[in-house]
Swiss-Prot record:
Name of the protein in its database record: Serpentine receptor class gamma-5
Family note: Belongs to the nematode receptor-like protein srg family.
Source species of the chain: Caenorhabditis elegans
Membrane spanning residue stretches: 31-51, 63-83, 98-117, 151-171, 193-213, 245-265, 272-292
One Pfam family, short name: Srg
GO molecular function: transmembrane signaling receptor activity
GO cellular component: membrane
Membrane topology term: Multi-pass membrane protein
Length: 323
């Protein structure tokens, strides 16, 4: 098998039978502890938005975009929990699964492509979420009209633009490489200069820049609203800070594989931290949204204490509607 990618030059072939499986199994159990609740929350949110309360959420552009983000996060979490993290952190399965992933190349290529497609999509989705909030504050009277015409273009752009990131993965060969006693997936880079890590990092850097810019404008404009909206401003500030910090940390680790000289001594650690950074993003995004939107919080947890109060503004959209 031709292994001409820089990624494959760092990792070794085959299973490392000298690795102690217990610490790796504990890593998987730890990740299982927060991934399962994350998957459940995403399923709950999507069932509410797409089915139970579709007439409420699917007429609002912000929640249409967020539902796409939730689908992307959910897909990544499912692939991580049942495939990616299993083959990495359960070394006992490596001797059986490694040959299958090595010889049946179509399956790992599909998994690898879908996973990185969703990762790229999240960067684009983040841009539209923050632009949507900014538009709501800058043009409250024309906000709904603008996004009613713009949302089909938004959906198409979110759907198609990730192919700019993964096109080289699709046409290249995917293969297993050893890591943490198990193995992960790499690709040969048929087009040598088209690095997946570089494309991913570029997308995330653009997303982070636009997020900071649009959120700053949104917060500046919100300061002119009534004092009763100060709690909403603090909530939005927290949400924006969280999303920006999560994207920044993920982009930082992405840049390690994209641009810096990498050695085996540090690659395992950075690979682990990179996965954790994306976990924070995928698991944290629905939690942040539930904290922001009182209506969504009440639908997710239908108890009276969670019901939104009329005097409390919990989202940018509701801020404009109540002023």
């Amino acid at each position: 098998m031709s292994q001409n990618s820089s990624f494959s030059d760092i990792f070794e072939d085959g299973c490392d039978l000298t690795y102690d499986p217990l610490p790796e199994n504990l890593k998987y159990l730890t990740q299982l502890f927060y991934m399962v609740p994350g998957i459940i929350i995403h399923f709950r949110i999507l069932s509410i938005m797409l089915f139970q309360h579709r007439k409420i959420y699917m007429i609002q552009s912000f929640f249409i975009i967020f539902s796409m983000d939730s689908i992307a996060s959910l897909t990544q979490l499912i692939l991580d929990l049942f495939i990616q993290r299993v083959i990495i952190y359960i070394p006992q399965l490596c001797p059986s699964l490694y040959p299958l992933f090595e010889h049946y190349v179509l399956f790992p290529n599909i998994i690898f492509s879908i996973y990185n497609y969703m990762r790229a999509a999240k960067s684009i989705i983040q841009i539209f979420l923050t632009v949507n909030r900014m538009t709501c504050v800058l043009a409250p009277l024309r906000y709904s009209q603008i996004w009613r015409r713009f949302i089909p273009v938004t959906i198409a752009f979110i759907t198609l633009s990730p192919f700019l990131v993964i096109w080289n993965v699709i046409i290249s060969e995917t293969f297993p490489v050893s890591i943490f006693g198990g193995f992960t997936l790499a690709y040969t880079k048929r087009v040598r200069w088209a690095s997946l890590s570089m494309f991913q990092m570029i997308f995330m850097a653009i997303s982070l820049t636009i997020t900071v810019f649009t959120t700053s404008i949104t917060l500046f404009k919100m300061r002119r609203l009534e004092n009763r909206l100060k709690s909403s401003e603090r909530t939005l500030c927290f949400a924006s800070f969280y999303m920006s910090a999560a994207f920044f940390s993920a982009a930082l680790f992405q840049s390690y594989f994209a641009f810096f000289s990498i050695t085996a001594a540090y690659t395992d650690l950075v690979y682990f931290l990179q996965g954790f950074a994306f976990d924070v993003l995928n698991v944290g995004s629905p939690i942040v949204m539930v904290l922001i939107s009182g209506q969504l919080r009440y639908h997710v947890i239908p108890v009276k204490s969670m019901a939104p109060k009329h005097s409390t503004v919990v989202s940018v959209t509701s801020v404009i509607r109540k002023t």
